[in-house]
A protein has these predicted regions:
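Short, solvent-exposed, mixed-charge loop/turn linkers that connect secondary-structure elements
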Residues: 170-172, 191-240, 383, 410-427
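Sec/SRP-type N-terminal targeting helices
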Residues: 3-8, 20, 55-82, 94-119, ...
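Small/polar, glycine/serine/threonine/aspartate-rich low-complexity segments that form flexible
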Residues: 30-91, 222-233, 266, 279-318, ...
Length: 427
């Protein structure tokens, strides 16, 4: 998935290079020859042109050579025996002077590259969030399986002791039956937790990859003692995350889109201007021939045009101005939505910390009560119903404690996700 996103960067870079190609120099050649009729003139023209961005300009050099006779209306084709060499420049003075379609496409191609980079950051941020979320979900299930397994092993050992007491006649058989029923409930719970753990492990293998991109098998039964959690949150991190909201990739994409529309709007305004182009050249013929072709020739030309009405440009300008206002409203709405999501995640994180403390205290208390109840039962001061209830409460409290701790990890992860900081940590 990440490799596919990176390919998008290469495609955006290629689009930028395509836009730059509008200013590539080029060579052209034209040949004309009269093959029949009274006149037998032949003309060859070669030109090298090099466009440049300023003033929609272009510089060129040209070489012409002709042979034979031309009619009067084609006298411009005539050159001396060695041909004519010239150099010239063409620029725009009004319309297309400050910008034109090529320069706008080049600017927007650069913005499109930046847009894709911002979008790729957002996509990778979401992808990392999904992968890490799947990891902590597996981690939670695996810890719960281990906790219930540990308590179940203790209960199984106690079952053996109860069997011995029943065989000796110290306890009624119904007491053992009640205890076995409680163990069966614990085994059913363990089976459900293992099913959940294995499902998350299977999903996690999609995100767990080798450096070559191959999926790796997760050891679902052995969670690490320390996952080296990189997304912890403190006061310093909160300040960093909050500041990162101003540079959120979703906002970058929209701001860059605004610049694209602004460029298009400027181009539409440019289309309303009259067209006034200047062309100047210096030419000199070489060799022998008519005297009127000898010497240096300088040419300066102006061309002017303006479409009456120009309804298309005016309509495009109005359309783009409306688009500018639309994007401004969307940007404000997106900024508010990003801030709201972050603040909501912040509230959840604060509550998650309090719940962890309470659930840890509750688990410790449930463990103590279960231990005390076992002592009372062995002394004959309690019955199996109360003992089983204490054991069930201990298991539930332990599971809730694990869930609360993992929920805190999820809350911290969500803060990084909403600030779009997972991508930077992944790098």
């Amino acid at each position: 998935y990440v490799r596919a996103i990176n390919e998008g960067n290469y495609q955006a870079a290629a689009e930028l290079e395509i836009a730059r190609s509008s200013f590539d120099p080029f060579i052209e050649q034209k040949t004309s020859s009269r093959v029949s009729g009274y006149y037998d003139g032949t003309n060859l023209t070669q030109r090298f042109s090099n466009p440049f961005e300023d003033f929609n300009g272009s510089v060129y050099t040209e070489y012409r050579i002709s042979d034979g006779d031309f009619p009067v209306y084609e006298a411009d084709y005539e050159t001396l025996s060695g041909g004519e060499a010239s150099v010239g420049i063409a620029i725009s003075l009004l319309k297309n002077r400050e910008l034109d379609k090529r320069r706008t496409e080049l600017a927007n191609a650069g913005l499109a590259t930046s847009q894709w980079q911002a979008l790729a950051t957002s996509l990778i941020n979401d992808f990392v969030y999904k992968g890490v979320s799947e990891y902590v979900a597996w981690y939670e299930s695996a810890l719960q399986v281990n906790a219930v397994t540990e308590l179940l092993n203790t209960a199984t050992q106690r079952e053996r002791a109860l069997v011995t007491r029943v065989e000796k006649g110290d306890l009624a058989n119904v007491v053992l039956t009640e205890f076995k029923a409680n163990i069966l409930q614990q085994r059913l719970l363990l089976a459900e937790l293992k099913q959940k753990r294995d499902a998350h492990a299977q999903m996690l293998s999609f995100y767990w990859r080798s450096p070559k991109g191959d999926m790796l098998i997760v050891d679902e039964a052995n969670p690490p003692k320390d996952i080296n959690w990189p997304f912890w949150v403190g006061n310093g991190q909160l300040m960093t995350l909050r500041n990162a909201l101003r540079n959120h990739p979703e906002l970058d994409v929209m701001k860059l889109e605004q610049q694209v529309v602004n460029n298009k709007a400027a181009l539409a305004s440019n289309a309303l201007l009259p067209k006034l182009d200047l062309k100047a050249s210096v030419a000199r013929d070489i060799g022998s021939g008519p005297s009127n072709l000898d010497g240096t020739e300088t040419k300066v030309g102006l061309s002017f045009s303006y479409p009456l009405g120009n309804r298309k440009a005016k309509a495009e300008q109005a359309q783009l101005q409306s688009k500018q206002r639309e994007l401004e409203h969307k940007l404000t709405s997106t900024e508010q939505a990003i801030t709201q999501r972050f603040e909501q995640a912040l509230v959840y994180w604060g509550q998650a910390k309090d719940i962890v403390a309470l659930q840890s205290e509750n688990a410790a208390l449930a463990k103590t009560l279960s231990k005390v109840e076992k002592t009372r039962f062995d002394a004959g001061d309690s019955d199996m119903f109360v003992l089983n209830a204490r054991a069930q409460n201990e298991i539930k409290a332990r599971i809730k404690e694990i869930k609360a701790k993992v929920d805190l990890l999820k809350a911290e992860l969500t803060l990084y996700k909403e600030a779009a900081m997972l991508h930077s940590l992944n790098n």
